[in-house]
């Protein structure tokens, strides 16, 4: 997860990727305020689903549980750092 990924939203401007959720789905937040969160689905075209901060937190925590079960430590540690920085 060492790569930083950005995406330009037509209304909210530059978004920063928080994490990959599953195939073709990633969680993004607004770059500066980190108050708006979007679940972005990429299946030929981009679809943005607005999430509340608490829903975004649940998505990240669910992904951390999944990584823990799969034993993917490096990505888990990076996501724990992002979780702490973003939600605490």
What is each stretch, according to the model?
Residues 1-55:
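Long, non-catalytic architectural segments outside compact domain cores
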Residues 52-88:
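Short, compact, well-ordered microdomains
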